[in-house]
Regions:
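Cationic, low-complexity basic patches in intrinsically disordered or flexible, solvent-exposed regions
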Residues: 5
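A conserved regulatory-domain signal marking ACT and ACT-like small-molecule sensing domains
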Residues: 14, 18-214
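Short glycine/serine/threonine-rich phosphate/pyrophosphate-binding segments
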Residues: 41, 134, 225-228, 312, ...
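Long, charged amphipathic helices and adjacent flexible linkers at domain junctions
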Residues: 105-117, 206-215, 248-274, 330
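Active-site neighborhood of HAD-like aspartate-dependent phosphohydrolases
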Residues: 209-259
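C-terminal cap/substrate-recognition subdomain and adjoining C-terminal extension
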Residues: 271-429
Length: 429
């Protein structure tokens, strides 16, 4: 019902815009301004249009390396257009910029307005660097699918020729495209193939209201927020490292049932002293970008959860460090002598449970499931990645990456912020 209402509103808006252009004396003109950017150009030129009581129908401006590109589409009358063009030309010459005029036919304008009801998508590409080959490949697929690129912008900061400092290099470009793809699934598949072939990450999202107001984000912990599997660390100290690591790898690839593998691995930890957990927690290797990601999410009011097949003890360490709101993981049973019993307490947090918890937290926080994000790397993360409004596979196993709608493999986990439309200029380092 809501989407039907939006469609009605779009059609009504399009009708109103075309009704504005009804007088045979009306004239629509597109002016394109280019040159060295300086303060006051936009103000001066729109000031002239204002003097002649012109109606602005569309406007767009960008600045690349101090070079201005400004476009203004406006409506006036036949009797005034000549005088307006003269004044604009004089002012542009005075300010040292170039100006070109293009008259727009009324029918062409009406057709342009009618296209605004089409679907819109956001395509985000990111990596350590973005190459012309990558952009050519992505834009080629966009064209093959019958989509039109409306806008391209850089979300990352300006890129130095020689990278210096301790901050990892990253680059992100966002495309806004319009239209109805011929085959959306095929387009998504081709994007993923290219990302593997050319070494970059790509995201395709519908540009709807939910994309701009996501409120809950749920993370896997092991090999996602931290660069290790805690159960493997415990196993090494228990002297069963190779055996447990093999079971872990098989489970994360989806080759064996998570519950079965978890029970077997925990049993092998029997007799390990609980003090070992603190030793591991004190040296947890934090994934690149976690600090920056958490700062940005907390500043913008996100609720943050850890939904992990690992252990509550380590999840709570991250909770205290970053102000995470919820932690759901597995609890190891410890006997009166401070030794692990080889058993766990309560229900296992497996893939099914992660998806259930995601839905439950959305209800608790009173947000639509479309406003949720899930990030994980293993096969047991797939249910929550599919259930969330935005599911992101992070440095994932091949099976997970093939299935996930979005993935990040080339940069840190703070790349999630670019999929949400964040710009570097919004985020303090």
């Amino acid at each position: 019902m809501w989407f039907k209402f939006i469609g009605i509103c779009r059609n009504a808006f399009a009708a109103n815009m075309t009704l504005m252009i009804h007088n045979e004396n009306d004239e629509i003109i597109l002016i394109s301004i280019s040159g060295h950017d300086k303060p006051g150009v936009t103000s001066a030129l729109t000031g002239i249009l204002g003097t002649f009581d012109c109606t602005i129908l569309d406007i767009g401006q960008s600045d690349i390396h101090h070079r201005l590109s400004l476009g203004i589409l406006f409506k006036t009358t036949n009797s005034l257009s000549g005088e307006i063009m003269k004044e604009l030309f004089f002012k542009a010459t005075e300010m040292g910029v170039n100006i070109n005029y293009t008259p727009i036919a009324i029918d062409d304008y009406r057709q342009w307005v009618s296209m605004q009801g089409k679907n819109r998508y956001i395509i985000t590409i990111l990596g350590r660097e973005i190459t012309a080959k990558q952009i050519s490949a992505i834009s080629g697929i966009v064209a093959q699918q019958g989509l039109n690129i409306d806008d391209i912008k850089r979300l990352t900061g300006r890129i130095p020729i020689v990278h210096e400092g301790n901050t990892p290099q990253r680059s992100c470009i966002e495309f806004s495209v319009r239209g109805n793809p011929i085959d959306k699934e095929a387009m998504q598949t081709e994007f993923m193939r290219l990302s593997n072939e050319l070494g970059f990450d790509v995201s395709l999202q519908e540009d709807n209201m939910y994309r701009r107001c996501r409120r809950l984000i749920c993370f896997d912990m092991d090999s996602t927020l931290i660069q290790t599997e805690c159960i493997d660390e415990l196993a090494i100290r228990a002297g069963v490292g190779d055996e447990v690591k093999a079971i872990t790898a098989s489970a994360m690839r989806g080759e064996i049932d998570f519950k079965e593998s978890f029970t077997k691995r925990v049993a092998l930890l029997k007799g390990l002293d609980e003090s070992v957990m603190k030793e591991i927690a004190d040296t947890l290797p934090i994934t690149e970008g976690v600090d920056r990601l958490m700062r940005a999410l907390k500043r913008t009011g996100y609720k943050i959860a850890i939904l992990s097949g690992g252990f509550t003890y380590f999840g709570n360490v991250l909770k205290n460090k970053y102000g995470i709101d919820y932690v759901y993981a597995n609890e190891l049973e410890i006997d009166d002598n401070g030794k692990l019993t080889g058993r766990y307490v309560g229900e296992i947090v497996d893939g099914r449970r992660k998806a259930e918890l995601l839905s439950l937290l959305a209800q608790v926080e009173n947000v639509n499931i479309a406003q949720t994000i899930a990030v994980g790397d293993g096969a047991n993360d797939l249910p929550m990645l599919k259930a969330a409004g935005l599911g992101i596979a992070f440095r994932a196993k091949p099976k997970v990456k093939e299935t996930a709608r979005q993935s990040i493999s080339t940069i840190g986990i703070d790349g999630v912020l670019y999929f949400l439309g964040f710009k570097d200029s919004f985020m303090a380092e």
